[in-house]
Amino acid sequence: MEDLLELAIHGLTLGALYAMVAAGLALMFGVVRLINFAHGEFYMLGGYAFWYAYRELGLPYPVAGLAATGILSAFGWAYEHTVIRTILARTWHVQLIATLATSITLTNLAILVFGTQPKEVPTALSSTILEVGGVRLAWQRLVVLAAAIVIFAGLEWFVARSKMGKAMRAMSQNREACAIVGVDVQQVALATFAISAALAAAAAVLVSPLFNIFPDVGALLTLKAFAAVIAGGFGYVRGAIAASFLIGITESLAAGYLSYAYKDAIAFVFMVLVLLVRPHGLFGRRIGI
C-alpha cells in the first residue's frame, strides 16, 4: 500500500510537470492556432536560467525561480514578436519547419553554452524526506503539487476574469471577429506566448531540483505535452491539464509495477486509446480554450 501511495504521488508530480507544459501548448494552439514544437525548449531554457541564478549567482530559491520565470516570459514575448509573427500567415508546413528549426537551434545553443553534462539543482527541500506511515517523499514533490494548484487556479482566474484573458477566450473562438471589433490580436498573441513560456519555466523551477536539466530535455517533454493536448481536446486548457495528470499517474504506476522501460511510451499509448474511444478528446469537441 505504501508503494502504491508513493507511486501515485510521484505520478502526480510528473502530471504537474506535464500539465504546466501542456497548458501553455494548449493555450498557444487555442488562441493563436499554432503548434509550437519548440515549446519544450522553453522548459529547458527556464531550467538553465534557474540553475544559473540559483547555483552560479547564489540567489535564494524563490528569487532565482521568479527571475527565471520572468526571463522566459520575456523570451516568449520576443519569440512571438520575431519568429511566430513572421510565419503565422504561412502554411502549416512552414510553421512546422520553423518551430522545429527553432527547437534544434536552441538545443544546440544550449550544448555550446552549458555543455552536454546534466546540471543538478539540489535544494534543501529536495533532499529533505517526509515520512508518514511508511510513505517516504521529498518535500520538493509536495511543493510542486501545492505550487501547481496555485498556478492553475491563477491561470483559471486570469482567463475567466481579466481583460486580457477574456480577449484570449474571444480570440480562441473567432480571431477575425475580434480584429473587426477592435481587439488588438497581436497583443493578445504576445501575451499568450509570454504566459505559455512562463508556465514552462515555472515547471522547470519547481521540478529541476528533482530531475536534472540537460540540452535535449525539451524534445521528449514536447511530445508528451502534445499527447496530453490531443487527449484532452485540442486547444482546451482544462482538458490538457486533466490528461497530463492521468498520463503522469499511469506512467508512474507502469514504471513501478511493470517496467521502467515502458515509462516513456505510456503518454502515446494513452493518447491512442483516448482517440479510439473519444476521437475529439476526453471532453469532446469544444470551441475556445
Task: Describe the predicted segments one by one.
Residues R33-F37, L57, L72, V121, ...:
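Glycine-rich phosphate-binding loops of nucleotide-dependent enzymes
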Residues L14, M20, R136-F214, V237-A242:
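Helix-loop-helix "hairpin" substructures at the membrane interface of multi-pass membrane proteins
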Residues L4-Y54, Y79-V94, A231-V237:
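Single transmembrane alpha-helix segments in multi-pass membrane proteins
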Residues M1-M20, A49, L57-A64, R90-I97, ...:
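Membrane-interfacial amphipathic/re-entrant helices at transmembrane-helix boundaries
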Residues Y18, G58-G70, L190-A200, A204-V205, ...:
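Transmembrane alpha-helical segments in multi-pass inner-membrane proteins
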Residues T86-R161, V188, L253, L258, ...:
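Transmembrane helix-bundle core of multi-pass membrane transporters
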Residues L25, G58-S103, L109, A242-I247, ...:
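Alpha-helical transmembrane segments within multi-pass membrane transporters and channels
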Residues M20, G24, L66-A78, A101, ...:
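Generic alpha-helical transmembrane segments of integral inner-membrane proteins
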